[in-house]
Amino acid sequence: MVERFMVVVSDIAKNICSLAAFSRLFYSGLFAIGLLLFGLLLTESVSLGGEWRVPAGGNVYRVEPEPGNATNREGVCTLKDAQQKYSIYFSVDRPCKVQLGVETRAQGSGSFQIAIGLEKAEIVVDQSDFADVMVGEFEVAAKGYVRVDVTKGKGGEVQFKDLVVKSDTAELKVDYVRDNEGNMFYWGRRGPSVHLSYQVPRGVDLQYAYSEITVPVGEDPIGSYFMANGFGEGYFGMQVNSETERRVLFSVWSPFQTDNPKDIPEEQRIVAVGRGPEVRIGEFGNEGSGGQSFLIYPWGAGKTYRFLTEVKPEGTGTTLYTCWFGDKAANEWRLIASFRRPKTDTHLKGFHSFLESFNPVLGYVGRRCQNGNIWVVDTKGEWHECLQARFSVDPTGGNRHRLDYTGGAEGDHFFMRNCGFFSETGKAGEVFKRTSTADQKPDIHFDKLPR
């Protein structure tokens, strides 16, 4: 009887344990399913939209009545005059609806107007401390850059810092200059720089680089640098410096690494050993340091200019760099300068071109150039045509602070384009091929060039 009782008790205990185990498994399963469903719901809620804060410090430009500084050092834009118009830019990767707001404050009470295309909204600001004020909903019909125009309304002075963008559009991606890390507000307002690295023959010592640039009419705003002949130790091209001044610029970096030319030891300084008429010689800094030369020259859009660079090691641990420039139609060659670089023993390497905006006030204005008839000459005097180029972009574009850049090949020339907030983005690393211009092979008597 006792044994039967013990067996019954044992069976009951086993059943109870099994039931407890089942219960634990059951509720654990429910909990896991609950977590999964919650995660899916959370993911779905995130994908359904978002909020982005577009800082004025890196994304706003004063466009009317004339370009100028848009913000103070704290990234605050002040609306004082109804005649002034400011434009803020951000990019979306698909059509969407956005709700816009502004982090703003006013002295007393003031108002301002926000517009995307023909859609407009006006708000009154009466708080003295910065706070977000939502303006309204706007329809964005296509992917790409969105321009938001801001103008002052009635009342007192109004300030704003951030443009607030909200949207319920699923998976929407918004790009803009996100922060000022690494002085990115400055670089972002300038815009992305793009480059073409040319394919040259391997295993050959190269002495000369030749190329031509044509800037289309209307694609030459102030602050443009159309760099034709870049090499491992410097660069050579033409600039738009102001409404009345244009330059041909040739620079060579010192082997001493510094952004302050005054820090360069005497034995590592770039030495000018020759210059052309009216060419000025000086120093440069901030992006490395070295020797710089420039000729004030009224080059014009729509015309083709040619550039020639010689890189010649002297056999004494120094290398001589010489550049010439000319109007192709005039069949002219002007000596720009000749520089000696110490602690250097090299032939031409790293042949490339680039397109740059160097004025942060005008980074909203686009530019474009055509680079063609590109050649290198080896130390035996043989010419080699450069028909292939690899495209690249600086970190401003590579890190998606700005997306308005592209490049490519059009028949017998390459092209580069940047700034202007156009809705096309090139692909870094892409290789372009142009058709040959062998029928335009340069005929240059190097020994007769001005030196």
How should these model regions be labeled?
Residues 46-91, 161-184:
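Glycan-recognition and processing domains
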Residues 185-277:
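Secretory/extracellular carbohydrate-interaction modules
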Residues 119-143:
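Extracellular carbohydrate recognition and processing domains
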Residues 299-333:
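Carbohydrate-binding surfaces in secreted/extracellular proteins
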Residues 92-106:
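A short beta-strand element within beta-rich, extracytoplasmic domains
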